[in-house]
């Protein structure tokens, strides 16, 4: 574990969706240090709040080196002559709540997540780790099928849809450490769930799936009820909506326990 992640865990600083070692490496974020602070940097931005190497406290006053922070942490506020700008939401979920999905607030998702698997005979669909499919079909074969799922998913977005972090998405799809795949008995891939984690949260990175009615709901249900996820006893940071109103509505129907506004902060001139 690198210095920044170690300090966050030691100080029990609650991280945001961008915090994991796997994401740092796959996105090209660089860890830097000065005499006082450790911080993550990429493309001219300090990505998240710098943290003091001695005290473990996050930066609380801008200085000549730190004049902006791209994405804040929960409860992190920069006082003084500063301004902030909305970046995205963060949706936090409790995986335990997906085991029962009780109450009227769950009615829509509870109904919709059952619709996709009802189209198939019992036992036809399987949800397995990527390693199992590699053993059954071979690495090259599965990687080609994963690429096709990605192509189909991108095509379903429409020509005017902006895909953020598409290069990072491909790295996770082909080389992610935590991937589980929904497939049929012939190895046809319907969707892929991809995640990583930090000391506080499991980060649900990507759901890449075919454009089939109610498949997205079923993929989320499979992820949240998976014994691997349940056994970690962690909350899940499901990321934001990247300006997509449909995605925001979709996530709100899953009854998040927290919806946080993530902001960028700037020092006023």
Q: PLM ranges: what are they?
A:
Residues 178-268:
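Aromatic (often tryptophan-rich) hydrophobic motifs at membrane interfaces
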Residues 52-62, 108-112, 163-167, 218-221:
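Well-ordered, non-membrane alpha-helical segments in soluble/globular domains
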Residues 76-85, 252-260:
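Conserved acetyl-CoA-binding loop of GNAT-fold acetyltransferases
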Residues 78-159:
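Acyltransferase donor/substrate-recognition loop-hinge adjacent to the catalytic core
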Residues 141-188:
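Short, conserved active-site entrance elements at the starts or edges of catalytic domains
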Residues 32, 59-71, 92, 126, ...:
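A structural signal for short, well-ordered beta-strand segments and their strand-loop junctions
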Residues 1-77, 183-212:
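Conserved donor-binding loop and adjoining core beta-sheet/short helix segment
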């Amino acid at each position: 574990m690198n210095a920044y992640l170690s300090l966050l865990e030691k100080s029990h600083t609650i991280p945001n969706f961008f915090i994991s070692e796997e994401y740092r490496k796959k996105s090209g974020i660089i860890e830097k240090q000065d005499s006082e602070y450790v911080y993550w940097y990429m493309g001219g931005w300090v990505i998240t709040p710098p943290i003091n190497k001695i005290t473990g406290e996050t930066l609380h006053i801008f200085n000549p080196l730190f004049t902006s922070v791209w994405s804040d942490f929960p409860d992190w506020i920069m006082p003084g002559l500063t301004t902030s700008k909305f970046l995205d939401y963060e949706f936090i979920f409790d995986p335990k709540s997906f085991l029962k999905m009780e109450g009227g607030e769950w009615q829509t998702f509870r109904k919709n997540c059952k619709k996709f698997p009802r189209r198939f005979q019992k036992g036809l669909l399987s949800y397995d780790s990527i390693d199992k499919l590699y053993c059954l079909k071979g690495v090259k074969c599965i990687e080609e099928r994963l690429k096709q799922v990605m192509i189909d998913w991108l095509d379903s977005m429409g020509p005017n849809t902006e895909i953020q972090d598409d290069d990072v998405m491909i790295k996770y799809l082909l080389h992610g450490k935590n991937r589980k795949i929904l497939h049929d008995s012939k190895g046809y891939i319907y969707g892929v769930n991809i995640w990583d984690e930090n000391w506080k949260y499991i980060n649900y990175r990507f759901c890449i799936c075919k454009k089939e009615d109610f498949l997205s709901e079923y993929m989320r249900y499979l992820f949240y009820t998976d014994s691997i996820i349940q056994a970690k006893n962690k909350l899940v940071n499901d990321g934001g909506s990247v300006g997509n109103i449909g995605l925001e509505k979709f996530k709100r129907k899953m009854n998040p326990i927290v919806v946080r506004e993530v902001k960028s902060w700037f020092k006023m001139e």
